[in-house]
A protein has these predicted regions:
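Karyopherin-beta/Importin-beta family HEAT-repeat alpha-solenoid scaffold
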Residues: 2-985
């Protein structure tokens, strides 16, 4: 019966496998995946045996075996550790190890896949082991691989050793994350001897190239074993000599020989291993001795080329600094690969990052940077890797793709595959070094000055590039030298007559450099001169239709406006209008979201810095068209995706955002929304404000919109600014906005704090009649949220909304608020620590303080008494008073303390029944305490009493409402002061 069931299961699995392998029906594939998961959970051993049988069958097509491996790997990732018994794990691990080592020459991709199965099984199996020993599963794999590798080495079987090294490489790659218990280090230690034995098969450079595959996997294993797992000084010296032998032949292989490519690839891995040693073992590098890095007699030598023949026994050439400088100084492409140069550059950068923590490393670097090698080395880095491409083809890109050309000046410093990026990192590390800054700066300035004097376009762009990125590391406290360079050399080049005669490549770098060094220009006169020059560049570039120069000049202008030295007196009279006209023209022409984001950022900075104050409504019209274009584009794409996708399935926002630079587009939309908000703060038209509701706010906050998932936080921020900046509630759109925000309060999503702030702000804007828009059901839900939410931000926002309801209520909602507040306070088990109690106490205080007379206060008191009585017998009126007194001890401000004291007084005065003497005495002492200290805060605020007394009442009110960032000129600020005036007295 069991065998029959197993057979049925295998047949079912085969059918599911075929669907997953070949079907293009998405629904069918999902159903098959779900059924397979169910079978795997119920009968994991049957699944493992069935897939193993297929993978082990040499009669099955290789692609089918490969597909089965993929299924097994997915199962191992999800279920191996918990769903498969230990005995079964051990059996299948042993089976797969035997399979790997038994098959002589499997297809390389299949061999890699099966070896990954072995690695995952060992990694995800039981990790229990004796102290200092490897887990049994891992030990078994290591022992099997090492034994097989030693047999292949002894037999000098290159083919067999190559396969075993492949298996070992995959295993080491998977194990390198197993650092707990030093598992990875233990695996690497077991590999030291067998790997050393394999190196004996390759005694010469010729042997390495002839046995390229063997050597490649040997280097890959060495990368993890010696570069990341085990520090072995003897190996480091041996491997350096081997690397020199490879480098010595660069550029000497016949053009049609495969050896050239083989040599470069092996050199890349060798350099990667040397780099890893520095990164993983910086504190042990002293064990290598200084001669490993730099030799004393190198000072008089010139920088060699990697293509220069060298003897393996020529000791001076065996220092690693000479090797790396030789690689860096060789022609890229013709002699060395870009990847090899990047790794050589990163080796130096990694050493420099460790110099502060290791005196030996610092000493090695000092020796090198003070040697005769260093200055030519640094000059080559600047001239070869920091120069712009200045060919006619490059210039044609200025008109074809101007936005990409302008953006290309901002190099990705994290790109480890770009020589320019790696050269920038090393240049900055050298000139910013603790131990080597002196000689590095001297060499850097000498190099750039020489390149500038050459006068050729390429070298000049390289020099300007180096100076530009060195705005921090090359700057000094005495800025007179740079200012002289700025006044005497740079600014004259920005004159329109000179620009017309200057290479566009040089002009672009000059404009860029001026912006990069903005922090070194501190005087108003100089800053004004620079901004005037940049304005002139803008006018010239617009006239000559040089979009690249326009974009670079705008970026440099932004640098000056955004830096800490900026003042309004820096701004030339016409600069702002020139910038706005230029931005407006560009926004209608550019296509790159990154460019739009940059332009929006510039205007945003101008607004935030105060350079634009009275043009808010005009700025809205500047940013609205591109914002609408992005929104319309995403709505259209969502509609198309929905039309072509499977029926009944919603559009995946991630898929839309990832397609065709979508995330970048939405990033620019976020910036445009911020700019719209900044503009509204300086506008004065309610019509302009509420015109954004249907075309921007609704499509960017609707749960069904394609853009919402990406921009809703900025959209709700903009919505809040709209409400704060509006002056009246007369616009029909304002009423629509309030209803829309109220509907969103019923959702459970991350924007709720902003939603409630919008509701609170709009209720204050509406001023009265809260009952017309807010229902008792709304209030019930808000009270529940306030009591149950763990988010302080959400509690603050909900509290502000309830304050607004209480202040604008005609009576019924205010009474309901008082009832809820009184009940919650009476029933609180720890009134001082629960975050909702203080807001609810202030709801009571505000309601009584806002009452127009004694009769209205008496009516509220009736509701409070009824609420307390509904809590009987656990809650009493006396307990309510006690809870309020306890809250005084944790009051956050003088304003709150005084409000609570007045609340206690009115509750005592309006009590339906005479209070006990103890209660009266308790309240009296609390009120006297508030009066004696001016209502100062308790120590929980972190401020002393004197500081608390000095705080202005409006400041404390804004803090209570969560409106600390509201400027005094905002219409919302004035409304808050009027609405809550009762708390200010």
């Amino acid at each position: 019966m069991h065998a029959n069931t197993s057979g049925v299961t295998r047949s079912t699995m085969d059918a599911l496998f075929e669907v997953l392998r070949s079907s293009v029906d998405n629904a069918a594939r999902k159903q098959a995946a779900a059924q397979l998961r169910d079978l795997q959970e119920r009968e994991p051993e049957v699944f493992l045996q069935h897939t193993y049988d297929g993978i082990a069958s040499q009669q099955l097509q290789a692609e089918l075996r490969f597909f089965l491996c993929t299924l097994v790997i997915a199962f191992l990732d999800e279920s191996w550790h918990n769903a498969v018994p230990k005995e079964t794990q051990e059996r299948f691990l042993e089976s797969y190890v035997r399979l790997l080592l038994a098959e002589a020459n499997p297809p390389i991709l299949l061999a890699r896949k099966v070896s990954r199965i072995v690695a995952l099984m060992a990694k995800r199996g039981s990790r229990r082991a004796q102290l200092g020993a490897l887990p049994l599963a891992i030990q078994h794999v290591v022992t099997s691989y090492v034994s097989e590798l030693e047999k292949a080495t002894a037999a000098q079987s290159h083919a067999r050793a190559t396969y075993v090294l492949l298996y070992l490489h995959v295993f080491l790659k998977e194990m390198q994350g197993c650092r707990i218990g030093n598992v990875f280090e233990g695996v690497c230690r077991a590999c030291v001897a067998p790997l050393s034995g394999v190196f004996s098969l390759l005694p010469s450079e010729t042997g390495m190239l002839e046995a390229h595959d063997l050597c490649l996997y040997l280097f890959k294993c060495s990368l993890r074993t010696f570069g990341r797992g085990v520090f072995d000084p003897a190996f480091c010296h041996f491997f350096l000599a081997a690397t020199w032998r490879l480098a010595a032949g660069l550029g000497q292989d016949a053009p049609d020989s495969p050896n050239a490519e083989r040599r470069q690839r092996l050199l890349e891995y060798a350099l990667k291993t040397h780099e890893a040693t520095v990164v993983f073992f910086p504190s042990r590098l002293h064990e290598l001795g200084i001669s490993f890095f730099v030799l004393a007699d190198e000072a008089a030598a010139a920088v060699p080329s990697a293509s220069t023949p060298s003897s393996a026994h020529d000791t001076p050439e065996h220092s690693i600094f000479r090797l790396l400088s030789a690689v860096v100084s060789s022609p890229v492409g013709d002699v060395v690969s870009e990847k090899a140069v990047c790794r050589a550059l990163r080796f130096f950068t990694s050493l420099l990052s460790a110099e502060d923590g290791d005196a030996f490393i610092a000493h090695c670097l000092q020796c090198y940077t003070t040697s005769m090698y260093f200055a030519p080395f640094l000059q080559h880095i600047v001239s070869a890797y920091l120069a712009d491409t200045t060919t006619p083809e490059a210039l044609s890109e200025w008109s074809r793709h101007p936005e990409q050309v302008a953006a290309g000046l901002d190099v990705d410093m994290d790109d480890e595959t770009s020589t320019m990026s790696c050269a920038e990192q090393l240049f900055l590390a050298l000139t910013g070094s603790t131990a080597c800054a002196g000689p590095s700066l001297a060499a850097a300035w000498a190099a750039v000055n020489q390149l500038l004097q050459e006068g050729d376009v390429g070298p000049v762009t390289a020099a300007l590039h180096a100076i530009g990125i060195g705005y921090y590391t090359m700057a000094s406290e005495d800025t007179s030298s740079y200012l002289g360079f700025l006044r005497g050399k740079l600014l004259p080049l920005l004159d329109p007559a000179t620009l017309a005669q200057t290479s566009p490549f040089v002009a672009r770098r000059v404009v860029w450099l001026v912006g990069m060094w903005c922090e070194s220009v501190t005087g108003t006169e100089d800053r004004r001169a620079v901004l005037s020059a940049l304005e002139t560049v803008l006018q010239h570039a617009v006239a000559t239709q040089s979009v690249v120069l326009v974009l670079v000049a705008l970026k440099s202008t932004e640098n000056f406006v955004s830096d800490n030295h900026f003042t309004l007196s820096d701004v030339p009279p016409t600069m702002v209008n020139t910038v706005l006209r230029t931005v407006q023209e560009l926004l209608s022409r550019v296509q790159s979201p990154t460019t739009i984001k940059g332009l929006a950022g510039l205007v945003h900075v101008l607004v935030e810095k105060g350079a634009l104050q009275s043009q808010g409504d005009a700025l809205v019209q500047l940013f609205l068209p591109p914002a609408l274009a992005v929104i319309e584009s995403y709505e259209s794409r969502a509609a198309n995706a929905g039309g072509t996708g499977a029926s009944g399935l919603g559009v995946d926002a991630d898929e839309i955002g990832d397609d065709e630079g979508g995330a970048d587009s939405l990033s620019s939309l976020n910036m445009l929304l911020e700019c719209l908000g900044s503009s509204l703060r300086h506008g004065d038209s309610d019509a302009v404000i509420w015109s954004l509701l249907p075309c921007v706010i609704v499509p960017c906050t609707s749960p069904t919109s394609a853009a919402t998932a990406w921009v809703e936080d900025n959209a709700w921020e903009l919505f809040l600014v709209m409400a704060q900046s509006s002056r009246t509630f007369f616009s029909p759109a304002a009423a629509e906005a309030l209803q829309m925000a109220l509907q969103h309060t019923t959702r459970d999503f991350g924007m709720l704090p902003l939603v409630f702030r919008v509701v609170y702000t709009l209720l204050l804007l509406r001023q009265d009649g809260a009952e017309e828009v807010v229902s008792p059901a709304h209030l019930e839900a808000w009270m529940t949220m306030l009591r149950e939410s763990l988010s302080a931000e959400l509690c603050s926002a909900v509290a502000a909304a309830t304050f607004a309801v209480g202040r604008t209520s005609a009576g019924p909602l205010s009474a309901l608020l008082c009832q809820h507040a009184a009940q919650a306070l009476v029933l609180s088990s720890d009134v001082q620590s629960e975050q909702y109690t203080m807001p609810l106490a202030m709801v009571l205080a505000l309601s009584f303080a806002s009452a127009t007379g004694g009769e209205e206060q008496q009516q509220l008191a009736v509701h409070v008494h009824a609420a307390v009585q509904s809590c009987a017998p656990s809650g009493t009126y006396s307990q309510l008073l006690e809870q309020l007194v306890l809250l005084l001890d944790v009051s956050p401000s003088t304003l709150v303390s005084r409000a609570l004291a007045r609340l206690l007084e009115v509750l005592c005065r309006t009590s339906a029944a005479p209070l006990a003497g103890d209660d009266l005495a308790m309240v009296q002492r609390a009120m006297e305490g508030v009066a004696a200290t001016g209502g100062s805060t308790a120590s929980v605020t972190g401020a002393d009493d004197e500081d608390a007394e000095d705080r202005a009442a409006p400041e404390m009110l804004l803090e209570l409402l969560g409106d600390e960032d509201i400027p005094q000129g905002s219409p919302h600020f004035a409304r808050v002061m009027r609405a809550f005036a009762a708390l200010l007295s």
